[in-house]
A protein has these predicted regions:
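Active-site loop segments of alpha/beta catalytic cores
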Residues: 1-31, 64, 89-91, 111-355
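Active-site-flanking structural segment that lines cofactor/substrate pockets
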Residues: 33-62
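Surface-exposed, active-site-proximal loop segments in enzymatic domains
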Residues: 34-41, 79-86, 102-108, 152-165
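Basic, amphipathic N-terminal segments that precede the first structured/catalytic domain
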Residues: 40-50, 105-117, 121, 125
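Active-site nucleophile and cofactor-binding loops and adjacent substrate-binding regions
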Residues: 44-45, 70, 235
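A contiguous, low-structure linker/loop signature
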Residues: 69-110, 126, 133-134
């Protein structure tokens, strides 16, 4: 079985050989850093190190992908925000922004040459040279709503959504321009999958109507410029917005452990069927082709659980019909490799029993 082709089959709606097991979210862990002698924060700013660490869990645990980068601050940094690159077990964080109000946000003319964007694009090339024919290369990027939160501060953005909604929508549109430019640059580097992460659009932070009217249209516009397979990841209890997530035009949606996979699949069947015409995504109503990725708990089971806990949760997800098996969100840096291996082993054992 060719691992890459198997994953792409699933995302294309074709019959696959076996349910893939990979990660569409943050993939680096300390134990892998120690085994590869490649560490954070250096791997955030060095293309060779980023590629090595991004493929480390394929080499060490059998995970069926390489995935970069390791945070959601690349775009904000290129926009002029100050970013603390963190430590060996702490991901980068935005610490300061030059933007005081929504109207201040402007896209620098040389945005794609700033910050770590060139590092990410070069790391894609390194991974393609090493793994291009064997495993899918996944590149994560920040969605426009979450990026706006980085640029203005999440609390400020959420407050202004009530007080000055028009200003915030304009700011999200400016962030969308940034995301579209970056998505086009990533697409030109030709990874296999782009995963758009919109954690700030979780129902715990905004209500489903705000998602439908503010976030969803921008995610549709972003989907239209992505020229690879595309996955949408939203954190939290995303069950209330599954129907809308499924009708945006992404090949798959990634959900966390508090989402009922069986119910989500049922809701997807009632989602929006999409038709691509001239590169545009059109919502046609009816059934959707979006697949479900998830949802082994990254904060509990993979981080703190036993091997038996991991295998039990994998079995539950596979029985529920998950299309691609994956951690529910980014891996905690102190997650043990043994638990990642157990996720792969449990998938294999599941298929051994049904054959």
């Amino acid at each position: 079985m060719n691992i890459k082709n198997n994953v792409l089959k699933v995302l294309s709606g074709e019959e696959s050989d076996i349910t893939p097991v990979l990660s569409v979210t943050q993939i680096a862990i300390v134990e892998a850093m120690e085994k590869t002698d490649v560490y954070w924060p250096e791997a955030h700013i060095n293309a060779d190190m980023m590629a090595i660490l991004g493929s480390s869990l394929h080499e060490l645990a059998g995970l069926e992908c390489a995935r970069i980068p390791f945070c959601l601050t690349v775009e904000a940094e290129a926009m002029g925000c100050t970013v603390d690159l963190g430590s060996i077990e702490r991901t980068p964080q935005v610490t300061e922004t030059p933007f005081r109000t929504a109207s201040d946000i402007e896209v620098p003319t040389d945005f794609l040459n700033k910050g770590r964007i060139p590092v990410v694009l070069e790391a894609i090339k390194r991974l393609k040279d090493e793994y291009g024919d064997t495993i899918p290369i996944i590149v994560g990027m920040t969605g426009p709503f979450t990026l706006t939160g980085h640029l203005l501060g999440v609390e400020n953005m959420l407050r202004d959504m009530k007080m000055r909604p028009g200003d915030i929508e304009n700011a999200v549109d400016n962030s969308l321009d940034v995301c579209m430019d970056y998505a086009e640059a990533i697409s030109q580097a030709e990874p296999d999958i782009i995963c758009v992460a919109e954690p700030t659009a979780a129902p715990e932070l905004i209500d489903p109507l705000q998602f439908k009217t503010i976030v969803k249209p921008r995610l549709e516009d972003l989907a239209n410029v992505i020229r690879t397979k595309k996955i949408l990841h939203i954190c939290g209890s995303s069950q209330p917005i599954i129907h809308d997530m499924a009708s945006i035009g992404y090949d798959a949606i990634s959900v966390e452990e508090n989402v009922d996979i069986a119910k989500a699949k049922h809701d997807l069947e009632k989602g929006g069927k999409v038709l691509r015409v001239g590169g545009k995504v059109m919502n046609m109503g009816g059934e959707t082709s979006s697949k479900i990725v998830g949802n082994i708990s990254s904060t509990q089971t993979l981080f703190r659980g036993s091997i038996e806990d991991v295998k039990e949760e994998v079995k539950k997800a596979l029985n529920a019909g998950v299309d691609i098996l994956a951690p529910s969100c980014g891996l905690a840096p102190r997650s043990p490799i043994a638990n990642i291996k157990a996720m792969v082993e449990a998938r294999n054992e599941f298929y051994d029993k049904i054959q």
